[in-house]
Regions:
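Short, small-residue-biased leader/transition segments that mark boundaries at the very start
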Residues: 3-9
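NTP-binding/hydrolysis catalytic cores, primarily Walker-type P-loop NTPases
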Residues: 246-268
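Cytosolic-facing regulatory segments adjacent to core modules
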Residues: 124-134, 144-180
Protein backbone atom coordinates (compact mmCIF):
# COMPACT_ATOMS: atom_id res chain seq x y z
CA UNK A 1 0.00 0.00 0.00
CA UNK A 2 1.15 3.53 -0.74
CA UNK A 3 -0.10 4.89 2.56
CA UNK A 4 -0.26 3.07 5.88
CA UNK A 5 -2.01 4.11 9.06
CA UNK A 6 -3.39 1.98 11.86
CA UNK A 7 -6.81 2.79 13.27
CA UNK A 8 -8.40 1.11 16.25
CA UNK A 9 -12.09 1.31 17.20
CA UNK A 10 -12.25 1.04 20.99
CA UNK A 11 -14.69 1.51 23.82
CA UNK A 12 -12.92 4.67 24.98
CA UNK A 13 -11.72 7.79 23.21
CA UNK A 14 -8.26 9.26 23.57
CA UNK A 15 -4.77 8.44 22.37
CA UNK A 16 -3.52 4.90 22.82
CA UNK A 17 -0.01 3.51 22.75
CA UNK A 18 1.63 3.60 19.34
CA UNK A 19 2.70 6.63 17.41
CA UNK A 20 0.76 5.78 14.24
CA UNK A 21 -2.40 4.38 15.84
CA UNK A 22 -5.59 6.45 15.71
CA UNK A 23 -8.16 5.70 18.39
CA UNK A 24 -11.84 5.95 17.40
CA UNK A 25 -14.59 5.71 20.00
CA UNK A 26 -17.05 2.96 19.06
CA UNK A 27 -19.87 4.41 21.19
CA UNK A 28 -21.13 6.83 18.56
CA UNK A 29 -23.29 6.72 15.45
CA UNK A 30 -21.98 4.73 12.49
CA UNK A 31 -21.98 7.83 10.27
CA UNK A 32 -19.70 9.63 12.77
CA UNK A 33 -17.29 6.68 12.76
CA UNK A 34 -17.29 6.77 8.95
CA UNK A 35 -16.54 10.49 8.93
CA UNK A 36 -13.64 10.08 11.37
CA UNK A 37 -12.17 7.31 9.23
CA UNK A 38 -12.48 9.29 5.99
CA UNK A 39 -10.91 12.28 7.71
CA UNK A 40 -7.93 10.13 8.68
CA UNK A 41 -7.65 8.78 5.13
CA UNK A 42 -7.56 12.33 3.77
CA UNK A 43 -4.73 13.21 6.14
CA UNK A 44 -2.74 10.21 4.88
CA UNK A 45 -2.80 11.15 1.19
CA UNK A 46 0.41 12.98 0.21
CA UNK A 47 -0.18 16.55 -0.97
CA UNK A 48 1.55 15.85 -4.27
CA UNK A 49 -0.93 13.08 -5.13
CA UNK A 50 -3.26 14.27 -7.88
CA UNK A 51 -6.37 12.51 -9.09
CA UNK A 52 -7.89 12.85 -12.53
CA UNK A 53 -11.57 13.72 -12.68
CA UNK A 54 -13.33 10.56 -13.85
CA UNK A 55 -16.84 11.99 -14.12
CA UNK A 56 -18.56 15.04 -15.55
CA UNK A 57 -18.67 18.25 -13.58
CA UNK A 58 -21.88 18.70 -11.60
CA UNK A 59 -24.51 21.15 -12.75
CA UNK A 60 -24.84 24.00 -10.24
CA UNK A 61 -28.37 25.16 -9.41
CA UNK A 62 -28.65 28.37 -7.40
CA UNK A 63 -31.67 29.56 -5.47
CA UNK A 64 -31.86 33.19 -4.45
CA UNK A 65 -34.66 35.67 -3.88
CA UNK A 66 -34.57 39.11 -2.23
CA UNK A 67 -37.98 38.26 -0.76
CA UNK A 68 -38.00 36.72 2.71
CA UNK A 69 -40.26 33.87 3.84
CA UNK A 70 -40.98 32.81 0.27
CA UNK A 71 -40.39 29.04 0.72
CA UNK A 72 -36.94 29.21 -0.87
CA UNK A 73 -35.37 26.65 1.47
CA UNK A 74 -38.40 24.34 1.25
CA UNK A 75 -38.20 24.64 -2.55
CA UNK A 76 -34.45 23.93 -2.55
CA UNK A 77 -34.67 20.91 -0.23
CA UNK A 78 -37.61 19.45 -2.12
CA UNK A 79 -35.78 19.95 -5.41
CA UNK A 80 -32.70 18.25 -3.98
CA UNK A 81 -34.59 15.28 -2.59
CA UNK A 82 -36.62 14.82 -5.78
CA UNK A 83 -33.51 14.96 -7.98
CA UNK A 84 -31.69 12.55 -5.67
CA UNK A 85 -34.21 9.82 -6.48
CA UNK A 86 -32.35 9.34 -9.79
CA UNK A 87 -29.16 11.41 -9.46
CA UNK A 88 -26.41 12.09 -6.96
CA UNK A 89 -27.16 15.48 -5.44
CA UNK A 90 -25.46 17.74 -2.88
CA UNK A 91 -27.34 20.52 -1.07
CA UNK A 92 -25.49 23.48 0.47
CA UNK A 93 -27.20 26.06 2.69
CA UNK A 94 -25.79 29.57 3.09
CA UNK A 95 -28.25 30.63 5.79
CA UNK A 96 -26.90 32.55 8.78
CA UNK A 97 -29.01 30.57 11.27
CA UNK A 98 -30.09 27.33 9.61
CA UNK A 99 -30.96 25.50 12.86
CA UNK A 100 -30.21 22.07 11.43
CA UNK A 101 -28.54 20.72 14.57
CA UNK A 102 -31.82 21.15 16.39
CA UNK A 103 -34.06 20.02 13.51
CA UNK A 104 -32.17 16.78 12.86
CA UNK A 105 -30.92 16.20 16.40
CA UNK A 106 -27.52 15.13 15.08
CA UNK A 107 -24.03 15.64 16.41
CA UNK A 108 -22.11 17.61 13.78
CA UNK A 109 -18.31 17.75 13.87
CA UNK A 110 -17.61 19.49 10.56
CA UNK A 111 -19.48 22.07 8.54
CA UNK A 112 -19.29 24.22 5.43
CA UNK A 113 -16.78 26.62 6.98
CA UNK A 114 -14.41 23.74 7.78
CA UNK A 115 -14.11 22.90 4.07
CA UNK A 116 -12.69 26.35 3.34
CA UNK A 117 -9.54 25.34 5.23
CA UNK A 118 -8.92 22.49 2.78
CA UNK A 119 -9.22 24.45 -0.47
CA UNK A 120 -5.50 24.33 -1.23
CA UNK A 121 -5.20 20.56 -0.80
CA UNK A 122 -4.90 18.23 -3.79
CA UNK A 123 -8.08 17.14 -5.56
CA UNK A 124 -7.86 13.66 -4.08
CA UNK A 125 -7.42 14.89 -0.51
CA UNK A 126 -10.16 17.48 -0.92
CA UNK A 127 -12.60 14.84 -2.23
CA UNK A 128 -11.99 12.71 0.86
CA UNK A 129 -12.33 15.74 3.15
CA UNK A 130 -15.66 16.48 1.46
CA UNK A 131 -16.86 12.94 2.17
CA UNK A 132 -15.82 13.29 5.81
CA UNK A 133 -18.17 16.24 6.45
CA UNK A 134 -21.06 15.28 4.15
CA UNK A 135 -24.25 13.89 5.72
CA UNK A 136 -27.56 12.63 4.28
CA UNK A 137 -31.30 13.17 4.46
CA UNK A 138 -32.66 10.12 2.71
CA UNK A 139 -30.74 9.98 -0.58
CA UNK A 140 -29.89 13.69 -0.57
CA UNK A 141 -26.34 14.58 0.48
CA UNK A 142 -25.75 17.83 2.33
CA UNK A 143 -22.91 19.73 3.97
CA UNK A 144 -23.94 20.85 7.46
CA UNK A 145 -24.55 24.62 7.42
CA UNK A 146 -22.10 26.74 9.38
CA UNK A 147 -22.85 26.79 13.11
CA UNK A 148 -21.39 30.28 13.62
CA UNK A 149 -22.95 32.56 11.02
CA UNK A 150 -20.03 34.98 11.30
CA UNK A 151 -17.94 32.44 9.38
CA UNK A 152 -20.19 33.04 6.38
CA UNK A 153 -19.59 36.78 6.53
CA UNK A 154 -15.81 36.65 6.87
CA UNK A 155 -15.15 34.42 3.84
CA UNK A 156 -14.51 36.34 0.61
CA UNK A 157 -16.47 35.85 -2.60
CA UNK A 158 -13.59 34.23 -4.53
CA UNK A 159 -13.21 31.65 -1.74
CA UNK A 160 -16.85 30.60 -2.04
CA UNK A 161 -16.57 30.41 -5.82
CA UNK A 162 -13.43 28.27 -5.59
CA UNK A 163 -15.06 25.98 -3.02
CA UNK A 164 -18.24 25.44 -5.03
CA UNK A 165 -16.33 24.91 -8.27
CA UNK A 166 -14.03 22.37 -6.60
CA UNK A 167 -17.01 20.49 -5.17
CA UNK A 168 -18.74 20.50 -8.56
CA UNK A 169 -15.65 19.24 -10.36
CA UNK A 170 -14.25 16.67 -7.94
CA UNK A 171 -17.14 15.76 -5.63
CA UNK A 172 -18.66 13.14 -7.94
CA UNK A 173 -22.13 14.74 -7.96
CA UNK A 174 -24.62 15.24 -10.77
CA UNK A 175 -26.11 18.36 -9.19
CA UNK A 176 -24.98 20.84 -6.54
CA UNK A 177 -27.81 22.96 -5.14
CA UNK A 178 -26.92 26.30 -3.53
CA UNK A 179 -29.51 27.77 -1.13
CA UNK A 180 -28.14 31.33 -1.13
CA UNK A 181 -28.64 34.34 1.14
CA UNK A 182 -27.23 37.81 1.76
CA UNK A 183 -25.15 36.36 4.60
CA UNK A 184 -22.22 35.81 2.24
CA UNK A 185 -19.87 38.06 0.33
CA UNK A 186 -19.76 37.61 -3.43
CA UNK A 187 -23.30 36.37 -4.00
CA UNK A 188 -23.29 37.77 -7.56
CA UNK A 189 -20.04 35.92 -8.30
CA UNK A 190 -21.61 32.66 -7.11
CA UNK A 191 -24.74 33.26 -9.16
CA UNK A 192 -22.60 33.81 -12.26
CA UNK A 193 -21.15 30.29 -11.78
CA UNK A 194 -24.59 28.66 -11.60
CA UNK A 195 -25.91 26.78 -14.62
CA UNK A 196 -29.49 27.60 -13.64
CA UNK A 197 -31.01 29.97 -11.08
CA UNK A 198 -34.46 29.94 -9.48
CA UNK A 199 -35.87 33.12 -7.94
CA UNK A 200 -39.15 32.85 -6.06
CA UNK A 201 -41.50 35.82 -6.40
CA UNK A 202 -44.74 37.01 -4.85
CA UNK A 203 -47.56 39.17 -6.21
CA UNK A 204 -47.78 41.82 -3.48
CA UNK A 205 -46.35 45.30 -4.25
CA UNK A 206 -43.60 45.08 -1.62
CA UNK A 207 -42.30 41.81 -3.05
CA UNK A 208 -42.51 43.10 -6.62
CA UNK A 209 -40.57 46.20 -5.56
CA UNK A 210 -37.78 44.05 -4.11
CA UNK A 211 -37.55 41.95 -7.27
CA UNK A 212 -37.44 45.09 -9.43
CA UNK A 213 -34.67 46.62 -7.29
CA UNK A 214 -32.67 43.36 -7.39
CA UNK A 215 -32.92 43.11 -11.17
CA UNK A 216 -32.02 46.79 -11.60
CA UNK A 217 -28.95 46.27 -9.42
CA UNK A 218 -27.86 43.31 -11.55
CA UNK A 219 -28.04 45.50 -14.64
CA UNK A 220 -26.13 48.30 -12.89
CA UNK A 221 -23.35 45.82 -12.09
CA UNK A 222 -23.46 44.43 -15.63
CA UNK A 223 -24.62 41.03 -14.42
CA UNK A 224 -27.19 40.45 -17.15
CA UNK A 225 -25.95 36.86 -17.47
CA UNK A 226 -27.51 36.16 -14.07
CA UNK A 227 -30.86 37.39 -15.37
CA UNK A 228 -30.50 35.22 -18.46
CA UNK A 229 -30.00 32.10 -16.33
CA UNK A 230 -32.83 32.96 -13.94
CA UNK A 231 -36.27 31.38 -13.94
CA UNK A 232 -38.71 33.30 -11.73
CA UNK A 233 -41.31 31.19 -9.95
CA UNK A 234 -44.59 32.44 -8.53
CA UNK A 235 -45.55 29.48 -6.37
CA UNK A 236 -49.17 28.40 -5.95
CA UNK A 237 -50.70 28.35 -2.49
CA UNK A 238 -49.90 25.02 -0.83
CA UNK A 239 -52.25 23.69 1.84
CA UNK A 240 -49.34 22.38 3.88
CA UNK A 241 -45.57 21.92 3.92
CA UNK A 242 -44.11 18.84 5.67
CA UNK A 243 -42.64 19.64 9.09
CA UNK A 244 -39.81 17.13 8.92
CA UNK A 245 -37.02 17.52 6.36
CA UNK A 246 -37.18 13.82 5.51
CA UNK A 247 -40.82 14.19 4.39
CA UNK A 248 -40.20 16.78 1.67
CA UNK A 249 -40.56 14.10 -1.01
CA UNK A 250 -44.33 14.03 -0.37
CA UNK A 251 -47.09 16.58 -0.76
CA UNK A 252 -48.15 19.36 -3.12
CA UNK A 253 -44.76 21.08 -3.22
CA UNK A 254 -43.07 17.78 -4.11
CA UNK A 255 -45.57 17.27 -6.96
CA UNK A 256 -44.89 20.81 -8.20
CA UNK A 257 -41.12 20.24 -8.09
CA UNK A 258 -41.31 16.91 -9.92
CA UNK A 259 -43.27 18.58 -12.72
CA UNK A 260 -40.62 21.32 -12.85
CA UNK A 261 -37.82 18.74 -13.06
CA UNK A 262 -39.57 16.94 -15.91
CA UNK A 263 -40.24 20.12 -17.90
CA UNK A 264 -37.08 22.14 -17.22
CA UNK A 265 -34.18 19.99 -16.03
CA UNK A 266 -34.66 16.60 -17.65
CA UNK A 267 -35.73 18.23 -20.90
CA UNK A 268 -32.66 20.49 -21.00
Amino acid sequence: ARWQRQMCIRDRSGTIAGENIRNINKYQKAENIYREITGEIAAMIPEEEKSLRSCDKAKIIGLYSPIRRCLQTSFALTLGQALSEKKKVLYISFEHYAGWNQLLNKSIKGDLAALLYFLQESEERFAVRLQSVTMQIGRLHYIPPVYAGQNLIYAKGPEWVELVEKIAEYGGYDYVILDLSESIQGIFELLKHCDRIYTITKEDPAAQGKIAQYEELLRDYRCEEILEKTSKKLLPVFTGIPERLEQYTRGELADYIRKLISEELEAA
